[in-house]
Amino acid sequence: MATQRMLQFVTKSKEMPVKRDADDRRDDFDEIYREFAEEKAVEQASRCSQCGVPYCQSHCPLHNNIPDWLMLTAAGRLQEAYELSQATNTFPEICGRICPQDRLCEGNCVIEKSGHGTVTIGAVEKYITDTAWDKGWVLPVVPMQERTESVGIIGAGPGGLAAADVLRRQGVQVTIYDRYDRAGGLLTYGIPGFKLEKDVVMRRNDQLAEGGVKFELNCNVGVDISFADIRAKHDAVIIATG
């Protein structure tokens, strides 16, 4: 039954979220594209051809389970779609906004190659995760069992934050050190708001903190604290400085 909702690319055209009018955009740095409405996200997800060999997944650096969460979205099972996207990606709503889908998943979509227009994978990924935040489905990490091992992470950019998320899910005690006053690295300081609004990054930082990740900000390693001191405090150290 679920597959009958799919393969709709022959009757439904590719559509992107509505772009905000230029007259509105020139007065702010808010994101350029509006959110999909639910019915439009369902429609666009249903265009997936459910390939036996999903090139979208194999060309994704994270190997996200794209066909399955598209199928769940098409079926209206958005919470399950979010949980599946989160299983392989710490920041699905951020990747949905800034990942170069045209060169990766969408650029290798089979129906794009056949002239039907790619599935709008990034826009759907953004939609299901933003919906998860709105519905309260995104919760702080609660490990099944706390462990005594401690890991220090130098750098609060996307690599450091993703490592912290994975380690906390395993119950490891994590402290992140960063010289800036806010976590996020390039996500916070390098990407303009019209591509990635900063509250999207901050809510992920807050989620990690609520899940037990400790942040030592305004802490310049080598100036405010030595590497030797960090090494002495932890069982292992990850250097994630970009």
Task: Annotate each language-model stretch with its function.
Residues Y82-N89, V124, L187-A236:
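N-terminal Rossmann-like dinucleotide/flavin-binding domain of flavoprotein oxidoreductases
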Residues Q173-T175, D235-I238:
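Beta-sheet entry/capping signal
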